[in-house]
């Protein structure tokens, strides 16, 4: 139990790192929550700071999820506090990742007012199901390019994930996942791309949660007032 609590606590602290707030202070000396949509996430960073800072913020928020789901769990597996949790590996990684997402949304370092958790949740899932998430990222980028709405891309990508898991698992009959081996700088690296059923259930819950957290964006989309991302230079 102590090991599980430690995993959740460390993951929460990592998720709480307020990336967009730090970027806003460093680049413009502002609290990004006072501009744009008022949200401290990647979407508002794109909107307020420009696409380059927005991209950096988003990538760092993604890394927070990967670290929580992969590195934190791996660390405490080798350095447990008492017994290591006897539970499904994917379920444990999902718990760690979700703790990071909660930290991102309710950040410890900024009055518990953070982002919407999309990028950190994406990072968590990249660490668990990288191939499926590569497809989701493709859908996200294509949607941003076509619609210029990061919010639309986030919602569509969230809906796509559980569908991709289900199609690969049941239609293509890939079972619980595949192991991949790649060469990097002359050294073989292996990783597992999970199709565990926990992912499909979790993906459905996350999709609903992301739709809920984007309800103001949906209202702005309906009214035609949702901001669009521009790929030119931000002045």
UniProtKB/Swiss-Prot annotation:
Catalytic activity: an acyl phosphate + sn-glycerol 3-phosphate = a 1-acyl-sn-glycero-3-phosphate + phosphate
Pathway where it operates: Lipid metabolism; phospholipid metabolism
Main location: membrane
UniProt cross-references to Pfam families, sorted A to Z: G3P_acyltransf
MF term (GO), any: acyl-phosphate glycerol-3-phosphate acyltransferase activity
Bilayer topology annotation: Multi-pass membrane protein
Enzyme Commission code: 2.3.1.275
UniProt-annotated location(s): Cell inner membrane
Disulfide-linked positions: none
Subunit structure: Probably interacts with PlsX.
Name of the protein described by the UniProt record: Glycerol-3-phosphate acyltransferase
Organism, as annotated: Pelodictyon phaeoclathratiforme (strain DSM 5477 / BU-1)
């Amino acid at each position: 139990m102590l090991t599980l609590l430690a995993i959740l606590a460390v993951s929460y602290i990592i998720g709480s790192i307020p990336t967009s707030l730090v970027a806003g202070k460093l680049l413009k000396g502002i609290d990004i929550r006072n501009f744009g949509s008022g949200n401290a996430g990647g979407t508002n960073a794109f909107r307020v700071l420009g696409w380059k800072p927005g991209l950096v913020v988003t990538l760092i928020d993604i890394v927070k999820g990967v670290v929580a789901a992969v590195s934190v769990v791996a660390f405490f597996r080798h350095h447990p506090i008492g017994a290591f949790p006897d539970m499904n590996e994917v379920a444990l990684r999902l718990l760690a990742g979700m703790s990071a997402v909660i930290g991102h949304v309710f950040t410890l370092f900024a009055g518990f007012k953070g982002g919407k958790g999309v990028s950190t949740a994406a990072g968590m899932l990249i660490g668990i199901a990288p191939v499926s998430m590569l497809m989701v990222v493709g859908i996200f980028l294509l949607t941003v390019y076509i619609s210029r709405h990061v919010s639309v891309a986030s919602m569509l990508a969230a809906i796509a994930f559980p569908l991709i898991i289900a199609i690969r698992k049941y239609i293509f009959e890939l079972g619980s996942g595949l192991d991949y081996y790649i060469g990097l700088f002359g050294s073989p690296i292996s990783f597992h791309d999970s199709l565990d059923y926990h992912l499909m259930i979790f993906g459905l819950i996350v999709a609903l949660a992301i739709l809920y957290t984007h309800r103001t964006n949906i209202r702005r989309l309906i009214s035609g007032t949702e901001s669009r991302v521009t790929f030119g230079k931000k002045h």
